[in-house]
A protein has these predicted regions:
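Structural/interface elements that position substrates and couple domains in central-metabolism enzymes
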Residues: 1-128
Length: 128
């Protein structure tokens, strides 16, 4: 399954990813076999892949396993592209551009995890 990770920086308006929750969430999803579509407007692809590789190495994964997991990552230039082929969307940084998306339409076909309380619950239903 492919999961969209929206936001890599530890907070909005920065490219600083040190200790970002997105790193840990993404690595755990990769270990569980997920593929990832990642988007952040300020953190570049190299930084994202380096963050993931560093944590996987620290967890003791071999080079072969690292390569397999890194191949399951797409870093995209738009959050809409990241969402497009994902079954679940995780908002992990509170970028203002995410506020304008029509989340109510998305949740009819995908699951949404809003880790930053960015979206009013009145704007979407999670189908409980």
């Amino acid at each position: 399954k492919t999961i969209a990770i929206l936001g890599w920086a530890f907070k909005k308006n920065t490219n600083d990813s040190r200790e970002s929750a997105s790193i840990y969430v993404s690595v755990n999803l990769l270990i569980q076999g997920a593929s990832l579509n990642i988007y952040d407007p300020m953190v570049n692809k190299k930084r994202i892949l380096d963050d993931i590789e560093f944590l996987l190495k620290n967890k003791g994964f071999a080079k072969k396993d690292l390569a397999l997991m890194l191949n399951k990552i797409n870093v995209l230039k738009s959050y809409k592209d990241a969402i497009e082929k994902s079954v679940l969307v995780a908002i992990l940084t509170e970028w203002d551009e995410f506020k304008d998306y029509k989340w109510d339409q998305l949740t009819k076909t995908r699951k949404l995890f809003d880790g930053r309380n960015l979206i009013s619950s009145a704007d979407y239903s999670i189908g409980i």
